[in-house]
């Protein structure tokens, strides 16, 4: 194990000791630091310490001591590691100064067979140009970003080397459009899952929103729909995400702060007042308590008179990435996976148009991973879900078409586009070859994209409009099915109505003014993009081999493998930013003195109002009916799940019992507490 990973493991052991003594106190302290204002709750992503140290700390952002290898950057051993790194850089700079020049043929010949024309160009035109004007790393302010040969080192944001020029020599000898790309709407889906691209239907403009009370969030939803939004995405507050009611001691000071507070069916009814759920697609970013919140949504639709078979939307419900990155887990992994598969089975039977999971790489990337790690870990999470469902006895072609994904769109324009293109091809290969899916809809990867909250800066926040515009354009050129674009003020606080509208308008400019939606996969055939796409695909399968050898993602998580990989990547990125090898405009270069903009403030009165509502609800509901429903839920949760027979779902499936409890107005906290009594709670192990 290298020094960085060893220190990450040491730090995780320190954090892992306290929960055994005081789990409740540990949860409240650590989760406030980890989750407050995270992308899951506000749309900006997890502002990990690796960014806040340099970019400025958000009022709702991640604390600088968040886990998995970040806090140890202050450790003496790590400082020594960093000093060695800087000395090595200085030595390379000295070598470069002594060097008369860089051989222009070296990069041209490295790992490839250039054409005679390219060789001639390198020896003549390029050589003369380098003599007159040496190359300088773009995005490096200090001049330390040099290769071993003394020449400028150009990389993607993830550190992948980038050549000066890409030609046919950078692609496999057998590369052809027919073999490697195919056509839109046809396998392997590199060029998209729809034959008409965005000509038939634009991507869904789904702005992530939720704050304070259900009443206030409902007003924001109506506002967004009025201004051209055609989908909704619900951000829940921290207590809801962790399965606590607003009047729980854990919730004090957190109610409505980084999302909307939803305690009961009554709150969900208010949240969607005036919104036709049969005509509006809704995404809900909720994980451990996903079954309870989804049940509330279904009952609201039922009360509106909607047909469950016609409603469409997405439940995030991706618990694996919580253990890897976001840390909003409640139950142990196996029990959590059981609840996820329950929703697969129930959804396949009763809500065939509703996506019962959105397998998320967004949070993995926000935690500091590279683009490749985001791609590989996210898709392999999908592999794990399919395998668990098949072990339950479910047919992959019944639940497979409703699996969806959620990716991050970061700053490196071409790397992100390549990631999206590779993702579709990889998923097709896995579903067809590994799992034997016959239904072509099971082969399709459909995904939502959100721009990178972790890339936003608190300094000069208007610059964030340009950042998210480029990130959003990359998602569109990569073929996303829906898109959220972060608001420019989200590094500081929850977005205001004005900043949220600006983010929506930016999507609309891309859609209606840029021409990006006029043609399908316009960067196909670019030697650079095709090389990046192949590298992403090959790199992902290399990770899959490692994860297979560990016994799957749950086993890998228990060993800490993905967590350590992300910690290492985040450390490397942060060091490069602090050394100004990577420029962040307005934060570590082009800095000015400025006044802070006006931000949205959530008062403490929200919590008091939610407590009063809960007290009134418990006074008027049938509490005996609630007690009976919760007891049935506990009995079902204790049963061994198995596949249903004769067209029916399993008797052990928890969803029908959760629905019964919801109809009786049991609260989120009461439902989650019933499951805690059966499953217990999870405390992350130390990693070595």
Where are these regions (language model features)?
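Acidic/polar, glycine-rich intrinsically disordered N-terminal extensions of enzymes
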Residues: 88-266, 271-278, 301-304, 542-545, ...
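Gly/Pro-rich turn-and-neighbor structural signature
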Residues: 120-162, 168, 173-176, 229, ...
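Active-site cavity-forming subdomains of large catalytic enzyme subunits
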Residues: 229, 251-391, 416-430, 461-469
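Short beta-alpha connecting loops at secondary-structure transitions
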Residues: 253-257, 282, 322-331, 364-369, ...
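Short glycine/threonine-rich loop-to-helix capping motif typified by GTGT followed
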Residues: 293-295, 368-376, 410-422, 451-465, ...
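Flexible glycine/proline-rich, aromatic-decorated loop/lid segments
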Residues: 395-399, 437-451, 459-488, 495-520, ...
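Long, amphipathic alpha-helical stalk/connector segments used for oligomerization, subunit docking
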Residues: 483, 490, 510-566
């Amino acid at each position: 194990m290298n020094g960085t990973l060893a220190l990450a493991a040491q730090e995780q052991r320190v954090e892992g000791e306290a929960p055994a003594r005081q789990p409740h106190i540990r949860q409240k302290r650590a989760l406030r630091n980890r989750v407050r204002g995270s992308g899951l709750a506000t749309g900006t992503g997890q502002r990990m310490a690796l960014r806040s140290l340099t970019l400025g700390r958000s009022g709702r952002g991640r604390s600088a001591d968040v886990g998995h290898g970040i806090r140890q950057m202050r450790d003496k051993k790590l400082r020594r590691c960093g000093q060695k790194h800087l000395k090595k850089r200085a030595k390379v700079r000295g070598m470069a100064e002594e060097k008369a020049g860089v051989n222009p043929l070296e990069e041209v010949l490295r790992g490839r067979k250039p054409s005679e024309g390219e060789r001639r160009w390198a020896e003549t035109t390029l050589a003369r140009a380098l003599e007159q004007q040496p190359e300088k790393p773009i995005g490096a302010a200090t001049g330390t970003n040099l290769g071993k040969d003394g020449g400028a080192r150009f990389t993607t944001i993830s550190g992948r080397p980038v050549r000066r020029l890409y030609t046919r020599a950078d692609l496999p000898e057998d590369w052809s459009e027919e073999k490697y790309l195919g056509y839109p709407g046809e396998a392997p889906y590199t060029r998209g899952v729809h034959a008409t691209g965005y000509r038939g239907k634009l991507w869904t403009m789904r702005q992530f929103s939720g704050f304070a009370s259900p009443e206030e969030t409902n007003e924001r939803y109506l506002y967004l729909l009025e201004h051209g939004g055609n989908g909704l995405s619900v951000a829940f507050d921290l207590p809801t995400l962790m399965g606590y009611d607003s009047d729980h001691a854990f919730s004090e000071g957190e109610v409505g702060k980084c999302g909307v507070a939803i305690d009961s069916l009554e709150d969900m009814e208010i949240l969607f007042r005036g919104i036709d759920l049969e005509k509006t697609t809704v995404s809900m970013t909720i994980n451990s308590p996903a079954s309870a919140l989804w049940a509330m949504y279904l009952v609201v639709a039922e009360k509106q008179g909607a047909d469950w078979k016609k409603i469409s939307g997405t439940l995030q419900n991706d618990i694996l990435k919580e253990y890897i990155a976001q840390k909003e887990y409640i139950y142990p992994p196996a029990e959590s996976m059981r609840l996820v598969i329950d929703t697969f089975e129930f959804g396949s039977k009763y809500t065939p148009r509703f996506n019962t999971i959105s397998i998320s790489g967004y949070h993995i990337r926000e935690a500091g991973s590279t683009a490749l790690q985001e791609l590989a870990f996210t898709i392999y999470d999908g592999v794990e879900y399919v395998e668990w469902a098949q072990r339950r006895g479910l047919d992959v072609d019944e639940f497979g078409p409703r699996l969806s994904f959620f990716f991050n769109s970061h700053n490196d324009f071409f790397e992100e586009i390549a990631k999206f293109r590779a993702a579709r091809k990889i998923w097709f290969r896995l579903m067809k070859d590994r799992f034997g899916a016959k239904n072509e809809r099971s082969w399709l990867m459909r995904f939502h994209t959100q721009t990178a909250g972790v890339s936003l800066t608190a300094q000069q926040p208007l610059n964030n409009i340009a950042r998210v515009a480029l990130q959003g354009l990359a998602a569109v050129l990569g073929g996303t099915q829906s898109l959220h674009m972060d608001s420019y003020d989200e590094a500081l606080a929850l977005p205001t109505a004005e900043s949220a509208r600006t983010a929506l308008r930016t999507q609309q400019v891309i859609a209606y003014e840029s021409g990006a939606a006029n043609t399908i996969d316009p960067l196909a055939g670019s030697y650079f993009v095709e090389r990046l796409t192949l590298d992403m695909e090959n790199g992902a399968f290399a990770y899959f081999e490692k994860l297979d050898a560990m016994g799957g993602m749950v086993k890998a998580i228990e060993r800490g493998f993905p967590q350590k990989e992300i910690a290492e990547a985040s450390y490397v990125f942060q060091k490069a930013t602090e050394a100004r090898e990577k420029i962040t405009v307005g934060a570590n270069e082009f800095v000015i003195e400025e006044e802070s903009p006006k931000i949205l403030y959530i008062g403490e009165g929200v919590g008091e109002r939610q407590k009063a509502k809960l007290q009134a609800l418990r006074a008027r509901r049938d509490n005996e009916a609630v007690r009976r429903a919760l007891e049935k839920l506990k009995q079902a949760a204790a049963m061994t799940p198995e596949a249903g027979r004769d067209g029916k779902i399993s008797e052990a499936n928890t969803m029908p019992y959760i629905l019964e409890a919801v109809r009786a107005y049991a609260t989120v906290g009461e439902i989650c507490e019933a499951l805690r009594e059966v499953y217990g709670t999870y405390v992350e192990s130390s990693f070595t």
